[in-house]
């Protein structure tokens, strides 16, 4: 929880509240995080600077998120735009990747005559209605396509779960 919060610009006060810890401990967590991962801080600053210069940031697929308030004189308004400058490339790229995976999965199902259906996408998760006799093949296709949707320096890792409802599948 702290990892995402820090990347998305959580304050010392916000982290202390979220983790139910004293503020000085939250400050130590945030400071320690950036000491351990200085590249994250560099990324955050570079993203804000690019946004200030261009007025937008991009995903790894080239989609743009325009940030008209990035140079606002109002610190609150500007801060919101700065957080979006940091978050949009990450979350937008994740959205791009899952859409690529969905297209590949759909095409594989069609090509292989799979009758099971993709029924829902929620953030980085896909839900399917799977015929029992297709369970292993569907799982194999989905994991392959989720993990191969986009090549990066770090591997994309996917997992799967099955159940008669969403809760069971987790």
Tell me the role of every PLM-derived stretch.
Residues 1-170:
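Conserved catalytic core of nucleotide polymerization and phosphodiester-bond processing enzymes
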């Amino acid at each position: 929880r702290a990892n995402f919060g820090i990347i998305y610009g959580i304050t010392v006060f916000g982290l202390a509240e979220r983790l139910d810890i004293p503020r000085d401990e939250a400050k130590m967590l945030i400071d320690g995080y950036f000491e351990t991962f200085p590249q994250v801080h560099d990324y955050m600053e570079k993203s804000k600077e690019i946004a200030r210069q261009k007025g937008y940031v991009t995903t790894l697929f080239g989609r743009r998120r325009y940030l008209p308030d990035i140079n606002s004189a109002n610190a609150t308004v500007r801060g919101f735009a700065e957080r979006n400058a940091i978050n949009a490339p990450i979350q937008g790229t994740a959205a791009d990747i899952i859409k690529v995976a969905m297209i590949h999965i759909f095409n594989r199902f069609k090509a292989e005559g799979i009758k099971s259906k993709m029924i829902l996408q929620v953030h980085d998760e896909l839900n399917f209605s799977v015929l029992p006799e297709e369970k292993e093949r569907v799982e194999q296709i989905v994991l392959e396509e989720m993990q191969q949707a986009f090549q990066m320096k770090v591997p994309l890792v996917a997992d799967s779960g099955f159940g008669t409802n969403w809760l069971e599948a987790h």
